UniProtKB/Swiss-Prot annotation:
Testis, brain, and to much lower levels heart, skeletal muscle and fat cells. Expressed in the retina. One of its GO terms (biological process) is intracellular protein transport. Its EC number is 3.6.5.2. It is a lipid-anchor. The keyword Disulfide bond does not apply. It catalyses: GTP + H2O = GDP + phosphate + H(+). Regulated by guanine nucleotide exchange factors (GEFs) which promote the exchange of bound GDP for free GTP. Regulated by GTPase activating proteins (GAPs) which increase the GTP hydrolysis activity. Inhibited by GDP dissociation inhibitors (GDIs). Interacts (prenylated form) with PDE6D; the interaction promotes RAB28 delivery to the photoreceptor outer segments. Interacts with KCNJ13; the interaction may facilitate cone outer segments phagocytosis. Interacts with RELA; the interaction contributes to RELA transport from cytoplasm to nucleus. This is Ras-related protein Rab-28. The modification Phosphoserine is found at residue 8.
Amino acid sequence: MSDSEEESQDRQLKIVVLGDGTSGKTSLATCFAQETFGKQYKQTIGLDFFLRRITLPGNLNVTLQVWDIGGQTIGGKMLDKYIYGAQGILLVYDITNYQSFENLEDWYSVVKTVSEESETQPLVALVGNKIDLEHMRTVKPDKHLRFCQENGFSSHFVSAKTGDSVFLCFQKVAAEILGIKLNKAEIEQSQRVVKADIVNYNQEPMSRTVNPPRSSMCAVQ
């Protein structure tokens, strides 16, 4: 195969991650791109970039450019520019925070406006994060599924903390954008286990302790 033929098998996709500041967007992007979970909560100001190259069926190499948009940018002058040109949009909410789910209407409104102006239609995925906190859920699954059905979204439930279905979410979004169908064996083959640290959302200084820091396993699917 020539160099030009090899290059033709490489694709780049722009994936924009939107949602409220506490929905876990940055943790989601970090778990996918770096296979880890941050020790401290860090608010995204403006936007952050993450890159990861994956291989889809047919030996197709795809580089995902993940744009993590700060939650405070809603209503800002730059948001439409961040969204412009995206092939995929992840609308992320915290399943334990109903307000973060309701606010997705505002985020999606901006996406629709940009899509109409640019005459392009990105794939939109609804992502319910923090499924490791199922016992604290305030957004019922039927609400999630109804929102998907009403707007034609793909549906995903993940945990950036444990890594549950994180890789699978991005993999499925990329495959759907490119019109590639994943079979069961390919999905199972993508499952791996990596080390991840548990986040501390308390921004106050931590007191000293003689106990070693806790950690968990981030099972990226």
